[in-house]
Amino acid sequence: MQPLIKTTLRTKRVAQQQDSELKQCLSATDLTLLGIGAIIGTGIFVLTGHAAAHQAGPAVTLSFIFAGLACAFAALCYAELAATVGGCGSAYGYSYAAFGEIIAWIVGWDLILEYGMSVAAVANGWAGYFSNALSALGHPLPDMLTHAPAKGGMVNLPAALIILALMLMLIVGVKASARLNAGMVFIKVLTITVFIALASGNMDISHWSPFMPYGWFDTMPDGKTVGVLAGASVVFFAYIGFDAVSTAVEEARNPQRDVPRGIIYSLIFCTVIYIVVAALLTSLLPYHELGVDSPVAYAMQKIGFNWAAALISTGVIAGLTTVMLVLYYGLTRIIYAMSRDGLLPHSLHHLNKQTQSPVRVITITGVLMAVMAGFIPLDELAELVNIGTLAAFVLVCGGVMLLRHRAPQLPRPFVVPYGSLIPTLGLLSCAALMIFLPAIAWMRFGVWLILGLVVYFIYSIRHSKLNQE
């Protein structure tokens, strides 16, 4: 029993982080835009209205602040580990160095769920806006081709096709993908700027009363959670993506300097934008009217700016495209790192000689996510994402403290300030947000982790590179 425990807790020395075979071409600006591209999307364009209508009311601004603080603590921890440990794979690589192999496997398995489900879920949202845009142009798609079977259709074809299109983009190479991302980020930031400018002149602060109609936290008879803290657990999804910057560490020109900057700059920018947009949106209409698919565009329409509503719908399509692109990118790099370490089949580690991209991983995951997006409804896809992300953040915050204790001699180009205070606050706040999630999310998450442990003990523990050493 003891040898088994020792085997599962073996750690990967930081010195073992091998020289990258990936192309090092991303600057600090590229990484910051990568983060903004991943973060600004579903949250600001959809979740703001839903959380205001069903969870927090106008106090959704407080929900964004609480969720943003939890993410800020975790982001600083990500930045320290990215600068210290390196190696693509995000929280997976950091956990391998800090906690040991089995925890790294659990985190990696968890991140595969998080990123894969996120891409498929966002593709569903993208498909809805795309279908609406085609209808507005007089070319509606048949309902059978825009809804999953559970929603009365045959297949959500636009959702599947956008993932396959992004698959081709990633196969071309990461720099081309970064250029597309930069262009899309510009479009959606322009869209948000237009909304802020127009909304600022049409505020009605009487809509902020009552400010906290659902209080801080409560559980309804049907099991639904409401209140500011429940809203924070929901809008937390809006921040998912900044950690994708840390998966790009092997493709950064100066990873120790630029990856922490990319993480922190993108999160600060997006947090400020979220709070401003949430405050303005809830001042335009009564909060209970905002539970629609496109609350920002809907609000513009209600106050008489139809042209702005059309522009915002275009921005939504651009915004959700970049979210999918960056999360898809992060997913492939995590699987690449796990394959390189022997925990997943080595064939997934293969790089295309011309583009230096993991084409096999990109293709396999793209096809699987396209199938999920085409045949599984949005609500079922999105339920698992938050709890998996929060679990990874808890381990990253703990990993900072553990690695400082285990390897104090390591060079740390970036160090989280105030000692263990911020990692502790990050660990506690992310754990608290997990508690506010519904029981069904915990049950499904548990099933996924059990499946992962079966794979680990049947395959990964024997094929691990550390086992061969």
Enumerate the language-model features and the residues they cover.
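Membrane-interface "cap" regions at the ends of multi-pass membrane proteins
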Residues: 1-49, 53-58, 71-76, 85-88, ...
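Extracellular loop-to-transmembrane helix junctions
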Residues: 44-148, 266-276, 445-453
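Membrane-helix boundary/coupling elements in multi-pass transport proteins
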Residues: 45, 87, 110-128, 234, ...
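Transmembrane helix-loop boundary segments of multi-pass membrane transporters
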Residues: 50-56, 60, 111, 121-128, ...
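Membrane-interface loop-to-helix entry segments
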Residues: 127, 154-205, 263, 382-395, ...
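C-terminal membrane-solvent junction of multi-pass transporters and transport-like membrane proteins
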Residues: 151-155, 166, 347-359, 393-442, ...
